[in-house]
Amino acid sequence: MSNFINIHVLISHSPSCLNRDDMNMQKDAIFGGKRRVRISSQSLKRAMRKSGYYAQNIGESSLRTIHLAQLRDVLRQKLGERFDQKIIDKTLALLSGKSVDEAEKISADAVTPWVVGEIAWFCEQVAKAEADNLDDKKLLKVLKEDIAAIRVNLQQGVDIALSGRMATSGMMTELGKVDGAMSIAHAITTHQVDSDIDWFTAVDDLQEQGSAHLGTQEFSSGVFYRYANINLAQLQENLGGASREQALEIATHVVHMLATEVPGAKQRTYAAFNPADMVMVNFSDMPLSMANAFEKAVKAKDGFLQPSIQAFNQYWDRVANGYGLNGAAAQFSLSDVDPITAQVKQMPTLEQLKSWVRNNGEA
């Protein structure tokens, strides 16, 4: 049974500036000797986990912060009815390796994702340890013997199970590290891009000349290739031994978000809220990106979208034949481009593609 789900998306963005660097310019990359506009994987992942769809279908995302004092206050508010304040503070101190007192500024060593439900479970263990007169070392030993019990709590923090978690201090270094089950590539345009510059003014209505500020902003449009894969076995392990069905359900939602969610940068100015034009999912025994379909930059032919889908389909056929791919595969497309090889099921709607993923690649 195939362990990896590969998700391929082609999405055409109208003029926009969805991801910028430290110089306030569009992020880019050289691929195939040509400049491509780029949207970082970090930007895509944040857009997904902060989306309304994520909240409605997966649940509350983790709290990512370096500011432990603020986290302490949030935990006191959310868990105060269940646990004594001293237990909450001690639990956070043990997990972070930092003294959590009444100081206003307490910083962790790095930005870390925290799950309220997971911390509540740790509070229960700390309270029980105090009742049993266990010191911190004995408590750590007891907890290390059943990591799976800890991982079950990540069902309330699926984004950590997907993207992973690094810990550099406290008990989290031994109990909280998670190898992410999902990999997301930086999205790049399928074609070369020469950006434009928007010259803009901020108008002062009370001044005769009108202008209060002059500025410039780089922007462009383009067809982007997005790619992600999910290691189903790793996801099951990260969720404390979840079933394959549970992992497939989460993968289904990732497919939806990768096809529909867009980073929010400059969106009040450009409103590039474009849905995906093509989504393909395939099951395989290894991660499999189709980015090399665009190593030779696509040339415009009545736009870039149609030739990009054609380039993808043709490259997929070559890879599938050359490597003998026989895992289930399905594609949803808004385009009238000739369909991909017959071995790839054609889905009329995104919802039908999601149902196919949910059913383990079966109609």
UniProtKB/Swiss-Prot annotation:
Stored InterPro entries: CRISPR-assoc_prot_CT1975
Biological processes, Gene Ontology terms: CRISPR-cas system; defense response to virus
One GO cellular component term: protein-containing complex
Subunit structure: Part of the Cascade ribonucleoprotein complex, with stoichiometry CasA(1),CasB(2),CasC(6),CasD(1),CasE(1)-crRNA(1). The 6 CasC subunits make a helical stack forming a groove in which the crRNA lies. Interacts directly with all of the Cas subunits. Stable subcomplexes of CasBCDE-crRNA and CasCDE-crRNA also form, both of which are able to bind target dsDNA, and at least CasCDE is able to form R-loops. CasCDE and CasCE complexes have endonuclease activity. Interacts with YgbT (Cas1). Binding of target ssRNA or dsDNA causes a conformational change in the Cascade complex.
Induction cue: Repressed by H-NS, activated by LeuO. Activated by the BaeSR two-component regulatory system, possibly due to envelope stress. Part of the casABCDE-ygbT-ygbF operon.
Entry protein name: CRISPR system Cascade subunit CasC
Top-level division of the source organism's lineage: Bacteria
One Pfam family here: Cas_CT1975
Function: CRISPR (clustered regularly interspaced short palindromic repeat), is an adaptive immune system that provides protection against mobile genetic elements (viruses, transposable elements and conjugative plasmids). CRISPR clusters contain sequences complementary to antecedent mobile elements and target invading nucleic acids. CRISPR clusters are transcribed and processed into CRISPR RNA (crRNA).
Observed phenotype of the null mutant: Loss of resistance to bacteriophage lambda infection, loss of plasmid silencing. Increased levels of 57 nucleotide crRNA and also 2 and 3 spacer-repeat units.
The entry's keywords: Antiviral defense, RNA-binding
MF (Gene Ontology): DNA/RNA hybrid binding; RNA binding
